[in-house]
Amino acid sequence: MTMTDATTTDLPRWSVADVHASLDARSFTDALEQARADADRLVALFDELDIRATDTRPVTADDGAAADRALRELNRVTDAVNLLRVYVYATVATDSRHQRAQAVFSETRQLDATLRPLSSRLADWVAALGVDDLADVSGEVHDHCGPLRRLAARAGHQMTEAEEHLAAELSLTGSSAWGRLHADVTSQLSTEVELPDGARVLPMPAVRGLATDPDPAVRRAAYDAELRAWPTVEVPVAATMNAIKGEAIALNRRRGWTSPVDASLFANSVSRPTFEAMQSAVTSSLPDLRRWMRTKASLHGHPGERGLRWWDLVAPLPATATSVSWDEGVDVVRQAFGGYGPTLGGLVDRALDEAWIDAEPRLGKTGGAFCARFVDDRSLVLLNWSGSADSTQTTAHELGHAYHNTTLAGRT
């Protein structure tokens, strides 16, 4: 019996019906229409207040009032658009074949493209006037000094206002569209796996999950199935990856970044010395990792120069190779979180009771795992449960993000 047989029964699926009953519900269509109108009004407000690149000059009380209005509205509209996007993505991420959801998701991306140039304009404006000086005359700036300083620093790596607006608009048919194509193609890919108890057609997330199956024959069968499956979509997948990275390289160059790495480090608030220290630690640890891999190969019956087989790369050790049921995995996470504190421990049951989690691998569902902020202090957690210790760790990891989101609830 494989983990796919033993553990997919009654795995949880998330529900967002308490926010809107469906994509066709009047409440949702009204909210989407309101968001469109609010986004257009926000652009008009930024034009009215002249929130854009300007010459350095002394800050006035009028600037403080402008900052208060702009930031309040930007936060309000952004929160509303984010809620709509995540609501729709809850369907797209679990069923990429849902045509209505795909169409509406494209509309939410259009809203993102409308709002994105406004953050660039705000960055130029606060960089010119100075965050600290604006904070003296604006309560909103005072309350958001940290993110606004980051935004002001970003102004040194922006194109002109017109170019940033064009980049946002073109992304809809560029990197954003290519990214959706990649997700659609890979989520809808399935393949036949020659399992010990007979051939089965499985979606790719489920096939990937078999890489941690206790049975080496299952792991090898899954590996062989992957090698047969991926070449069938290699042309569109390669095209999407090249297009997305090509756009990023071009934009980073036009924005004055010396390398794509520097742009990524800034976006993730990681300094170059910190990055280099981490890289140095990884490099110095590689001999230990190689020794461990050779030891693991021997434990799996593959001693000698050929070393660890690909299908055993993430396999459990033979002595610990057991399947983990969903309930067992949840218990492990609950106990570990409870050891930290009752609030974190209680989050596990709350996430289950309130249907935050979608755990079942299935055709049309995005691979991997993620946690997305949703509404109030609530998150959505996507998993592709495979019944392994790795799946248990992934569940803990994503619920850890959910806990982080609860602590950030209400912040802008």
Give short role names for the model-derived ranges.
Residues T295, L299-G345, H404:
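Long, K/E/R/D-enriched contiguous segments that form extended
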Residues S119-L122, V126, Y340-L344, G410:
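A sensor for short, sequence-defined functional sites
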Residues T322-V324, I357-D377:
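Catalytic zinc-binding patch centered on the HExxH motif and its immediate surroundings
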Residues M1-P318:
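A well-structured
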Residues R272, L299, T406-T412:
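Inter-helical turn/loop segments and adjacent helix faces that build the functional surface
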Residues S22, G256, S386-L408:
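Active-site recognition of the HExxH zinc-binding catalytic motif
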Residues V348-D349, L382:
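Long, positively charged low-complexity segments
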Residues A321-W326, V332, F374-A396, G410:
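Short pre-active-site segment immediately N-terminal to the catalytic Zn-binding motif
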